[in-house]
A protein has these predicted regions:
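Well-ordered beta-strand positions
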Residues: 132-134
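Bacterial N-terminal signal peptides
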Residues: 8-17
């Protein structure tokens, strides 16, 4: 009986240590320590930068029942869903709303421009619609990684950078990105309460 208890104890310790070793690694860096995150009442979401992993593309090509490839629009939907679940205290603006407002105000449809030109016009006009904006970037190499850079809309000053690196077992799917975004919004909320 004693040996059985010892074996189960060792097994439990081993399982907890394995899950900790493969857990996602996250880091937030405040670029401007003087900026008060409580000043953010409206946060605009810029179109996420995302490219499917080679493994996802290969699966889609070879397997008939493979999951659908993720698109930036799908990621934007997840961002809004997660923000609603986490009950964030600020208003979120979608990239489509901001782009539509910029098109009406300037007469320029930035979706027809190159990324560089579109971002320049976006940065020039975002101050009219939001207090800050966030640019999400997703990388899919050997590990799934999400970056979120938050900028002040008034002067495009870099406020903070958030990075989360998935563990070895994380895959290129919406469930993982949803988990990453929950962590991002919770971290942003905690930082704003400091």
């Amino acid at each position: 009986m004693k040996k059985l208890v010892t074996i189960f104890s060792l097994l439990a310790i081993m399982l907890f240590s394995i899950s900790t070793a493969f857990a996602a690694n996250e880091k937030i860096t405040m670029m401007d320590e003087d900026y008060n995150l409580k000043n953010i009442h409206t946060l605009a979401i810029y179109t996420p930068s995302y490219k499917p992993s080679a493994l996802s593309i290969e699966r889609k090509a070879k397997l008939p029942n493979a999951p659908e490839l993720i698109t930036p629009d799908m990621l934007t939907e997840v961002i809004f869903k997660v923000a609603k679940e986490d009950e964030v205290t600020y208003t979120l603006l979608s990239d489509k709303d901001v782009i539509q407002n910029i098109t009406i105000a300037t007469g320029t449809d930035i979706t027809t421009l190159s990324n560089r030109e579109a971002l320049a016009i976006y940065k020039e006009n975002i101050k009219n619609y939001a207090d800050a904006y966030v640019i999400f970037t997703f990388a899919n190499d050997s590990r799934v990684v999400m970056f979120a850079d938050v900028y002040d809309a008034k002067d495009n000053h870099w406020i903070c950078s958030y990075q989360i690196i998935g563990g070895d077992t994380e895959d290129d799917n919406l469930e993982n990105y949803s988990m990453f975004m929950h962590k991002f919004f919770r971290t942003l909320t905690i930082q704003s309460q400091k």
